[in-house]
Swiss-Prot record:
Keyword ATP-binding: yes
InterPro entries attached to this UniProt entry: CarD-like/TRCF_RID, CarD-like/TRCF_RID_sf, DEAD/DEAH_box_helicase_dom, Helicase_ATP-bd, Helicase_C-like, Mfd, P-loop_NTPase, RecG/Mfd
Biological source species: Rickettsia bellii (strain RML369-C)
Lineage: Bacteria, Pseudomonadati, Pseudomonadota, Alphaproteobacteria, Rickettsiales
Name recorded for this polypeptide: Transcription-repair-coupling factor
Localization per record: Cytoplasm
Top-level class of the enzyme under EC nomenclature: hydrolase
Cited function: Couples transcription and DNA repair by recognizing RNA polymerase (RNAP) stalled at DNA lesions. Mediates ATP-dependent release of RNAP and its truncated transcript from the DNA, and recruitment of nucleotide excision repair machinery to the damaged site.
Family: In the N-terminal section; belongs to the UvrB family.
Binding site for ATP: G604, D605, V606, G607, F608, G609, K610, T611
Domain named Helicase C-terminal: residues: 777-931
Amino acid sequence: MLQQKFPQAAKSFFTIDSFIKNSKQDFVLVTSNEEEALQLYKQALFFLPSENIYYFPSYDTIPYDHTSPNCNILSKRAETLSKLTTNKGNKLVITHATNLLNKLPPKDFFAKYYLKLFPKMKLSANELSKFLVENSFTRNASTVDVGEFAVRGEIVDLILPESKGYRINFSWDYVESIKQFDIDTQISTRSCNELIISPANEIVLNPETISNFKDNYLRNFGVNHTDNPLYEAITGGRKFSGYEQLLPLFYDSYSGLTDYLNNPVIIFDNLTKQAILEFEHSYNDFYKARLDANKLKFNSFYPTLSPSQLYFTSLEAIELLEQENNILISYENSEQASIVENIAAASFVEKKTIFDKLFEVIKANSRKKIIIGSSVLSSFERVKSIIENYEYSYNEIEYLEEAKTNTINIAILPLNQSFSTPEYLFIAASELLEEKVTPTNTNKKLKNILLELDHLAEGELIVHKDHGIGQFLKLEALEIKGKLHDFLKILYAGNDKLYIPVENIEVIKKYGSDVAQLDKLGSVSWQKNKAKLKNRIKEIALHLMQIAAKRKLNTTAAIEFDLEEYDKFCAKFPFTETEDQLNAINDIREDLSNGMLMDRLICGDVGFGKTEVAMRAAFMVAKSLNENSPQVAVVVPTTILCSQHFARFTERFKDSDLNIKQLSSVVSSKEAKIVRSELESGKINIIIGTHSLLHKVTKFCNLKLLIIDEEQHFGVGQKEFLKSLKSSTHVLAMSATPIPRTLQMSMTGLKELSIIATPPLNRLEVRTSVMPFDPVIIRDALLHEHFRGGKSFFVVPRINDIEDIEKQLKQIVPELSYKVAHGKMSPNKIDEIMSEFYAGKFDILISTTIIESGIDIQDANTMIIHKADMLGLSQLYQLRGRIGRGKMRGYAYLTLPSHKKMTPHSLRRLEIIQNSCALGSGFTIASHDMDLRGFGNLIGEEQSGQIREVGTELYQEMLEEQIAIFKDEPISGEQPFIPTINLGLSVFIPDNYVSDSVLKLGLYRRIGNLNDDLEVEKFKDEMIDRFGSLPTEFNNLLDIVKIKLLCFKLNIENLDSGDNGFVIKFYKNADMADKILKFVSTYTANAKIKPDNKLVFIKKLVGKTIITEANQLLWNLSEI
C-alpha cells in the first residue's frame, strides 16, 4: 500500500495532481464525513473537469428507518450507478466510507434500465411514460421535485438529479425536441442534443423486480401478507415509505460500490477505518432496536432483514481498503496550510487591513497563478468588488486550466483553507470574508408549490361580489348554442345554483373559512350587508390614515450620534451582516434622521438577525448627542424572552457606558421599585421588560425609542398602553409573522416595512421528516441530540396527549429526563420550567404549542411533533422555527398515527412543510395559512367579525380600495361591473391538453388575473411552451379575455353574437349616449339602437371570423 503525506486543505488538488491526472485507472476517493465528500467532488470538477467524476451520496436516514431518503439523494445514487455501468473511460468516484458497506443492486442491472433520447428518435410519449413509471419516477400534474414527471398530450416534463428539468416534445411517435426548463417558472431555457435518463431509485418496480420481491418475501418471512399495506403497495407496483431497507428482496444478487469500477485504486485517510467500524456498530444497534420495537407491535407491517442481508461487514470493507494498490493519505501541519492566518497576523502587527497585506503576498508570488475561491456567488461578487477597488486586474474562471499568471483568478470553488503549491497559490474567500456555509435558496420552489395550492378546491366556500357567500361545487362544461363552455358551478341557499363562465372567474374570491351560512340568490340582504361593511371599512381606513398622518405631523429632533463610536460598536458584531440586515439598518438611520417619528415594522424569519438590527437602533438613540438622557424600551411578551434579550443586550453593550436593566416577574418587588425609580430619573438608558413594563406606575425620563418584539402576543389593555407611548416616541416593531392589521398598514403604505429575508451565512436548514410514529427513530433522534450536548422539544397538539407520551418516553428513552409545560399551568410555573430547560436541567420538554413563539434556546435542536396532521401550516412552521437557531443543524420529526388515513389536504400541508426547509419561507407560509385556516383570533374581534361577512380576499381588496381613494391614487380593486361575452364559441381547456382538474382551476384563476393584452400574450407563450400548441377552445378563451378587457374600457356590460351580428349592452351608469349616436351615424347601414338602449350591429358572421369581427367592431367603437 502506498502512503502519501500533504496538507489536508490541499487533499483534492494533490490527490488529482499526483495520482489521477495522468492515470489510466479507476479511482475511489473515500472520506470520513459526508460534507467533505461533497466539497471534494466540487473541487475535483474544478481541478479536472470531466464527465467521469462522480459523487455517490449516502442516505440521509438511519439504518432500518421506515422513512425514505430524500428524493434528490435517491435519484443521484441511481444516476451515478447507471453512469458507472454505461459510461466509458477512467472514472473517479468520491463517496463517504459508509457506502463501502452498502449492498447495492447487481452491477449488470443498470445496463438494462437506462434510456438515451435524441431528436428524431422513434419513441412515443406513452412509451416514455411507461419507461419512467417502471424506473421509479412519479407521475404528477406538474413537476416540482426530482424524480417526478408530467404528461400533457405530446409533451413530457421530468426532473433529473440536481433539479434539472427537461421537456421532451413528440410528434407522430418521434422525439421532436429536447429542452431544459426552469423548474420555478416552468418555461424552457435551452435546447439539448441528447438526454440520458437513469432510474430515479436503486429499486425499480417492474414485473421482474416485483416477482423477485414476492419470492424473496415468502422465502424470508414465510407467508404473503396480503393485508399488509407495504406488501400490497409494492406488489401493486407502488412505492412505499422506507421500502429502500428491503432492497435485497428485489434482486437475485448484489454488488458493492467498487464492483461497478474496473479494479479501482482506493484513496483514503486514517479516519476512514474508524468511520466504517462506527457505522457497523450503528447498524447492528438499530437492528436490535427494530426487533425490540417489532415486539411492541409498532409499525409491525415492516419486515426486518438481518444486517448480513443489507450490509458488508467491517472486516470485508477494511480488507478492501488494505489491498496492495490502494493509497493511504496522512496530513502534514505545514506553514502553507495557514496562509491567511499569517496574513491576518502580519496585517495586525503592521496596522494594515487584511486585504492590504493580502495584495502584498500576491505581489510576492507573482510567478504563481493566484486563485481566490468562493463557495457562494455573493462572496465571489464581494471578492470581485474588493479587487476592483484596489485596481487590480482579475480573471473569472470556471476551471483550473483557465487560470493565468500576472492577474488574480477568481472562481466558484469551495475551500476551507488556503494553501500553496509550486505552481499555484489558492486563497480561500471563506477565511477573508468569514464565509461560513453555502446557503441554498429554494424559496422559488416554495412559491411554486404555494401557487399550485392557490386554486379553488371542490366544496370550498367562495364569495361572489354580487351574490354573496356560496360553495364551489365543481367545474362543469355546458352546451351553449351547440358549443361547449366551461363554467364554475356555485351552490347557494335553497339548493340554488349559479354558473359562472371561466373567463369571469375573478368575480369570486376565496372566503377563507370552512364555516359560514350560504346566501340566497336574488336576496337583497347581501348587498345591504356589503354596503354597511363598506361604510365601516371607510371608517377603518380613515382611522388608519389619521394615525399615520398624526405621526407625520408630529415632528421631532433628528437623532445625531458619534459615527466613529457607532462604527466601533458595529465592528464588534461577530458575524457578517446580510444585505437585508444592512438595508433595514439604513432604513432606520434614515427614519431617525428625517425629523419625523419613526413607525417601522421589521419582518424577518426566526433567527435572521432582527435583534442585531434592534440593538443598532437602540445604540443610535441611547447615544444620541442632541437629547438629554434618551431612553430605549424593549417590550417582549414572555419572561424567558426578556431574560434572553437582557443577556444579549448586556453582552453586546458591555464595552459601552450605557446602563441596561430588565423588568419582569424574575425581578423582585424591591428591585423593581429601584428600577422604576432609576427609569424615571434617567439613570437607565435601555430597559427590557415584559407586561410589567406596561403599567401606569412606570414613568420614563425621556423615552425616545420603543422596540416591540412580537406585538401580536400582547393583550388588549397592554396594546392600549403601547398606543399611548407611540404618539410621541419612535417605534420599531419586530415580527416573523405580523398580525394582519399591522401587515395591512405596511402593505397599504401607512406603515414603513423592512423585510429581512436572507439567512445568516452560518445558518443551516432544519431537516424535516414526515413519518408514522416510530419509537426506534424517536429514540435515535432524542439520544443523538443528547450525545451532541443538546436538548429536545416534544410537542403535542392537546393536553390530553401528554400522559400517553410520558408513558411512551419512559419506555423509549428511560435514560433521559423530561418536564411538562402546557397552557393550563400558571404563567410563573411555565416560566420556571422554561428557565430550567434553558439552563439545561433536563433533556426533553414535553409541551403543547405554547412554545411556538418567543423561545430562543440555541442548544435545543431536535423537535418531535406528535399528531402533526392536527396542526396548521403556520403553527408547524413557527414550531419548527424554535430549533436550528445556532450553528448546529436542527432536526424536526412530524409524526402521524400509524394507521390513520390522512386527507389529501392534510398530506399536502405536511408535504409543504417538509419541502419548505428553505430559510426565510415563514412569512410566505404564514400568509398562505391565514388563507387556508381563515381568520379567527388572528385578527381583533371587531375586524374578525367584519371579515366573516365577506371573507378574507374581498375584505382586503375593499380596504385597499378605500385607502387608495383617500390617498387619491388609482384604484386597482373592485370593478363596478364584469363584462359578459357570448360569441357562440367553444371556450374551455380540453382534458387532453390539461388533464388534472386542480392544475386546470389554477390556470383559470391566473387567467382571471390577466390585466392587459401583453400579459395575455405572455401567458399564451407560456402555455405553448409547457403544454404544446393551443387547442382552438383554449385559444378562444384567451381571445375572449382580450375582448373582455376592451369591453371594460368601453363600458360594455354584455357582448352577444348571433348569425346576423352583435348586440351590445352598455353599463347602466356609463355616459355613452354621444358616442353611440356618433357610431350609429357613421355606420348607418349596420348599426341600430333598440328601445332598451342596446346597440345592434348587423353583419353575417361565420365561425372563424367572429373573433376578428368582434375586435374590429370594438376597435371602431373606441375610435369614435
